[in-house]
């Protein structure tokens, strides 16, 4: 099977995506698939005489990509392309994807995760991993997804949606501390915990650099967990223990982080079972399929969903691979099961 691992793009999570993509490519090759990584935005330069199908015959191996400390803006990334064009799909990308039997989406954030790339693939009858275009857009939009959660009686934090016209000194219905985050962001980029009006104003200024729409949530004190769902099966939860601060971009992706991951977590069986049930319920409510990850906070008042991730990270430090490992599933088997699980869904649609 020829598999194009689509990574990169031009979101602020580009570096994380390239790390996920390189590891996925290596894993699929180790399972015998003809896999190659394609940079969505920078494209692929064909060699003389090379066809689109030949791209998958390359013997080159993908090396693990180091995640940089710096977060690139969209303008920074556009400068990386030397042909002067700014369209999302780089040179030769779409024809290569059409030549593939399957596309493994290793994209994170922006148009790679909000359903737009998925819609292009749907229109071109290209099979891909993860949720469809509508569910991807819903899951990426924190405000809409939280409204759907509340409608389905899934506990989540109180929140307000702000726009630039609301200014940086809004009147909110809940007290400090609060959490400020871009509505359609990921990897905790632009996210901060604020304790007073001055910090709120400064955080809103920063968050508006990444999104025109901002979510401000009540801060819920509790233990933080993450739980993946693969092909309808909930993985063991993993507890995230941060000793210095909170689980931000640096703690998620930098190897020097002091963050501890505990799996299986030391929690009561009924709480663990409840998180598994709510994770599956949340994905079903949002229309998500194939695989995803749901993040939680728990305390004496219950289990609260922070958010659902429709294309969770697959880097060496990412949560879903650690959860799968705790369930006895190797990284290589996890990648293969995602492809085969989505293929099964496509086959069922034909019946």
Swiss-Prot record:
At which positions is Mg(2+) 1 bound? 295, 307
One GO term of the biological process aspect: regulation of cell shape
Offer one Pfam family short name for this entry: Dala_Dala_lig_N
Q: Which domain of life is it from?
A: Bacteria
Q: Which GO terms describe its cellular component?
A: cytoplasm
UniProt cross-references to PANTHER family, sorted A to Z: D-ALANINE--D-ALANINE LIGASE, D-ALANINE--D-ALANINE LIGASE B
- Record's protein name: D-alanine--D-alanine ligase
Q: Which organism is it from?
A: Pediococcus pentosaceus (strain ATCC 25745 / CCUG 21536 / LMG 10740 / 183-1w)
- Its gene? ddl
């Amino acid at each position: 099977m020829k598999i194009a691992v689509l990574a990169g793009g031009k979101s602020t999570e580009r570096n994380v995506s390239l790390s996920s993509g390189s590891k996925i490519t290596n894993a699929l090759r180790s399972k015998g698939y003809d896999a190659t990584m394609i940079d969505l935005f920078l494209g692929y330069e064909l060699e003389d005489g090379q066809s689109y199908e030949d791209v998958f015959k390359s013997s080159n191996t993908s090396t693990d990509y180091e995640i940089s400390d710096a977060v690139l803006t969209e303008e920074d990334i556009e400068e990386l392309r030397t042909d002067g064009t700014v369209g999302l799909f780089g040179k030769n990308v779409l024809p290569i994807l059409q030549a593939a039997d399957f596309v493994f989406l290793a994209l994170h954030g922006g148009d790679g995760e909000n359903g737009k790339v998925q819609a292009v693939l749907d229109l071109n009858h290209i099979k891909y991993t993860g949720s469809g275009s509508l569910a991807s857009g819903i899951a990426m939009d924190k405000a809409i997804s939280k409204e759907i959660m509340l409608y389905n009686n899934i506990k989540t934090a109180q929140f307000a949606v702000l726009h630039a016209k609301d200014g940086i000194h809004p009147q909110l219905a809940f007290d400090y501390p609060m959490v400020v985050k871009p509505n359609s962001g990921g990897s905790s980029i632009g996210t901060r915990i604020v304790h007073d009006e001055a910090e709120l104003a400064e955080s809103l200024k920063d968050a508006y650099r990444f999104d025109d729409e901002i979510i401000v949530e009540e801060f819920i004190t509790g233990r933080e967990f993450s739980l993946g769902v693969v092909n309808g099966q909930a993985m063991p939860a993993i507890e995230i223990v941060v000793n210095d601060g909170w689980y931000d971009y640096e703690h998620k992706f930098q190897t020097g982080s002091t963050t501890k991951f505990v799996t299986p977590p030391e929690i009561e069986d009924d709480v663990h079972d409840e998180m598994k049930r709510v994770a599956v319920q949340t994905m079903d409510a949002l229309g998500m399929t194939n695989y995803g990850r749901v993040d939680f906070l728990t305390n004496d008042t219950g289990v609260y969903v922070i958010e659902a991730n429709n294309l969770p990270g697959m880097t060496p430090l990412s949560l879903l691979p650690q959860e799968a490992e705790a369930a006895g599933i190797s990284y290589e088997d996890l990648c293969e099961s995602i492809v085969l699980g989505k293929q099964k869904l496509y086959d069922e649609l034909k019946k």
